[in-house]
Amino acid sequence: MAMNTETLSLIKQSIKTIPNYPKEGILFRDVTSLLENATAYKATIDLLVEHYRSKGFTKIVGTEARGFLFGAPLALGLGIGFVPVRKPGKLPRATISQSYELEYGHDSLEIHTDAITANDKVLVVDDLLATGGTIEATVKLIRQLGGEVQDAAFVISLPDLGGEARLTALGLELVKLCEFEGE
């Protein structure tokens, strides 16, 4: 994806790295510092809108919670609907759920059963791609409802954690605005 290197540099430099959080040996990439910088936040959304404007998406699906912060403004910029995927018990209408594995245990996500139809071409958006488990579960939910999903966008990717390979194996084309080495 050809994007303005100056803008991509602004985005990457706006993301603070917190050593040893949430545990020793981890370099935490704090996307909230990007949100605090209005210029960088707007540039992030503008780049994604520009890239996806002519792709024909009908819905954006964002994963709880930081996927909402990028998915919803992107949906507005594209003039299409936004669908949240949430933890169990947070959505008021009928839902379906999908479990997925975590490093220690498992979790699940839910989506409204009427939020996606067979006519929908869906873009999945999240702030960060690590192992890919959350997005894999999200893709399964969308496909179970009949939606077409072949694309996912992330502000940050941590390629060493294997998520990119996991999601490309699902047939997804990935857009990542910046990458960081390590965990």
From Swiss-Prot:
Sections of the chain in a coiled coil: none
Acetylation listed as a keyword: no
Keywords: Cytoplasm, Glycosyltransferase, Purine salvage, Transferase
Signal peptide: none
Molecular function per GO: adenine binding; adenine phosphoribosyltransferase activity; AMP binding
GO CC annotation, single: cytoplasm
PROSITE patterns: PUR_PYR_PR_TRANSFER (PS00103)
Listed Gene3D superfamilies: 3.40.50.2020
Enzyme class: transferase
Catalytic reaction equation(s): AMP + diphosphate = 5-phospho-alpha-D-ribose 1-diphosphate + adenine
GO term, biological process aspect, one: AMP salvage
Pathway given in the UniProt record: Purine metabolism; AMP biosynthesis via salvage pathway; AMP from adenine: step 1/1
Location(s) in or outside the cell: Cytoplasm
Location, primary (coarse class): cytoplasm
EC numbers on record: 2.4.2.7
CDD domains for this protein: PRTases_typeI
InterPro entries found in the cross-reference section: Ade_phspho_trans, PRibTrfase_dom, PRTase-like, UPRTase/APRTase
Function: Catalyzes a salvage reaction resulting in the formation of AMP, that is energically less costly than de novo synthesis.
Subunit organization: Homodimer.
Family affiliation: Belongs to the purine/pyrimidine phosphoribosyltransferase family.
Name of the protein in its database record: Adenine phosphoribosyltransferase
Organism: Shewanella oneidensis (strain ATCC 700550 / JCM 31522 / CIP 106686 / LMG 19005 / NCIMB 14063 / MR-1)
